[in-house]
């Protein structure tokens, strides 16, 4: 896994930016009826600077973008607007799944959240058992108000000085 690096994406340009736009358009842009240009516009305003949110992080293997995640004050979970900030858009390229990319990304989430001044994060997902091994605590199952995925599981990570390391 030491060939995987995680770095902050700060510019709306380059191969990594193009990849995250493509991933997000295919993942939720199409579902939400957005064009590729609309997703690109959204992503260009999702990079942040300094300690401000949102922030976007890219996983690279041998210099190539293979995954991403974002820290954000908001998410599209309309049923729980009282929960924030969020870990969103956790994505690993299909050809890289099962090869340690998610673990490498999760090992940096708490540190990056703490650097942004956050004390905790929320995420929602259908995946049962994935995030628990990285220190996330299941909170509740909530409605999403979407027909394709009517309920999701909400998790919380207490950032503190946590450094997540998973042994295989």
Predicted region positions:
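Conserved N-terminal entry element of GNAT/NAT acetyltransferase domains
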Residues: 1-18, 160-167
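Active-site rim helix/loop that mediates acceptor-substrate recognition in acyltransferases
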Residues: 24-60
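Short hydrophobic/aromatic beta-strand or adjacent loop that forms the aromatic wall/cage
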Residues: 54, 149-155
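Conserved beta-strand in the GNAT
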Residues: 56-58, 64-74, 86, 91
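Active-site beta-strand termini and strand-to-loop segments that position acidic
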Residues: 60-62, 157-158
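A conserved beta-turn-beta hairpin within the catalytic core of GNAT-like acetyltransferases
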Residues: 74-87, 97
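Conserved acetyl-CoA-binding loop-helix of GNAT-fold acetyltransferases
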Residues: 89-92, 98-111
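Conserved active-site alpha-helix within GNAT-family acetyltransferase domains
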Residues: 115-119, 125-150
């Amino acid at each position: 896994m030491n060939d995987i690096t995680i770095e902050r994406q700060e510019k709306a340009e380059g191969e990594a930016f193009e990849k995250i736009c493509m991933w997000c358009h295919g993942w939720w842009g199409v579902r939400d009826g957005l064009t590729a240009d609309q997703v690109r516009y959204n992503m260009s305003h999702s990079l942040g600077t300094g300690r401000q949110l949102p922030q976007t992080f890219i996983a690279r293997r041998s210099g190539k973008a293979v995954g991403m995640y974002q820290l954000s004050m908001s998410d599209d979970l309309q049923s729980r607007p009282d929960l924030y900030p969020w870990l969103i858009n956790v994505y690993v390229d299909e050809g890289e799944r099962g090869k340690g990319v998610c673990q490498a990304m999760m090992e940096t989430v708490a540190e990056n959240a703490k650097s942004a001044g956050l004390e905790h994060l929320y995420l929602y997902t259908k995946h049962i058992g994935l995030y628990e091994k990285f220190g996330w605590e299941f909170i509740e199952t909530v409605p999403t108000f979407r027909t394709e995925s009517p309920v999701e599981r909400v998790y919380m990570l207490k950032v503190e000085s946590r450094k997540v390391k998973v042994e295989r």
